[in-house]
Every structure is written in C-alpha cells, then in structure tokens.
Regions:
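The feature marks the mature, well-folded catalytic cores of soluble enzymes
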Residues: 1-217
Length: 217
C-alpha cells in the first residue's frame, strides 16, 4: 500500500506560532506553563510535559502553583527575582481563553503572561467585541460553532450583549426570523465550513426585516 503525504500536512499557522512561542519560553528556562492545552495533540503535550511544562486547567490551579512563590517571597534575594526565579511564565493556548480569565491572569503577581492565541482567533475576538457594541446598546451575537469548543468559550466572552451559539444553521436562522427587528452580528468558529457560513449569511439577509450586521471569520 502506498501512503502519500499531503504537502499541506502539519500544523496550521496558529498552532505553529504557539509552539514556537512555547519553545522560546522552554529554552529561556524557569517556571513555564500553559493555560489550557497549548494544542489538541496528546503526543505534543506529553513531549512538553517531559520538558517540565505544566498545563493549567483553571485559574485556581495557577493560584495554587504560585503559593510557594508567596511563601518564600521574603527569602528570595533581588538577583534571583530579576532572573525570573520568582515568576511563572504562562502561555495562553492557541484556541484563546475568555476575556475575563485573561484579564485576571494578567493582574496576578509573579505571572508573566504571553498570548499564543491564533492570530485569526484573536482577530475574531476583537471583531466580535467591536461589532456587538452599538452606541450605548448592544447587538446580539449569532455564533456558528460548537458550544463545547474552547475557542468558542473565548469568542463569546467578547460579545457585549447576549449571544446564541449553534453548529446548526437552521437554529440561527430560526432565531433571526423570530426576532426581525433585532440587530445582530454573525460570526463563526474559525474552523467551521465557509460555504455553510455563507449560506447562513444569505438566509439572514432574507429573513430579517432589518438587515443584520454581518461579520465573517
């Protein structure tokens, strides 16, 4: 049997950038961790775990990891502090994290936070934040995606008002039909099918009494 490897096989741009940033932190030394799995690949995660990289699944886990830093704060001299021995170098996963979580982590003492969110995901987060703000009011976000996916957790956290998530186009279209006077923003999880997204976009234009604001990821 002949096995042909696609020329495009390998990590996507966002994942490749995230791993590059993580490699830089590992080479630098010190305490290194990621908030959430850096990517969804158990073999890669195991490789980094063997290098001493910790994967934190919650803010509480990060706070618990910092406790030894606080306990020995008074016994660590200034030189060691400058060398980063009293610092956790924490990398945000490629899928991104919720806005409130990122803000909290940035304000934690002894945490140096580095953002490894995929540039396309970060662009989507910022666009959702901007598009869902309407003067003093807000617009409803219709998100085409999987509610259980970590990227989606981050995306909807940037919505200024309410949001509807569904991987089923019909449900998003149905919501628009039932709320014709409501201003809406359409966005998608970055891994969703563009052709299906365009179908939803077209249907929303036809269904809404007032044209919804459309934004595509």
């Amino acid at each position: 049997m002949e096995v042909i490897r696609s020329e495009r096989a390998g990590f996507c741009m966002g994942v490749a950038l995230a791993l590059k940033k993580l490699d830089m932190l590992v080479e630098k030394g010190g305490h290194v961790g990621t908030f959430g799995p850096i990517i969804h690949n158990p073999f890669v995660l195991e490789e980094y775990a063997m290098k001493g990289v910790r994967c934190f699944g919650s803010v509480q886990a990060v706070k618990e990891a910092l406790e030894p830093f606080y306990v020995f704060l008074e016994t660590i001299d200034e030189e060691k502090r400058k060398e980063g021995q009293l610092q956790l170098n924490l990398l945000i996963r490629a899928h991104g994290i919720p806005y409130s979580t990122e803000s909290f982590l940035r304000n934690l003492p002894h945490v140096q936070l580095m953002d490894a969110t995929c540039p396309r995901v970060k662009e989507a987060q910022n666009a959702i934040s901007k598009a869902t703000q309407c003067g003093q009011g807000t617009r409803t976000l219709l998100l085409f995606g999987d509610a259980n996916h970590p990227e989606v957790d981050g995306l909807v956290s940037y919505a200024k008002g309410k949001y509807i998530i569904s991987p089923e186009p019909e449900k998003l279209i149905e919501y628009a039909k039932k709320n014709p006077g409501e201003e809406m923003v359409l966005a998608a999880q970055t891994t969703q099918d563009r052709a299906v997204f365009d179908t939803i976009k077209k249907a929303l234009f036809e269904a809404a009494a007032t044209q919804p604001i459309i934004w595509a990821t």
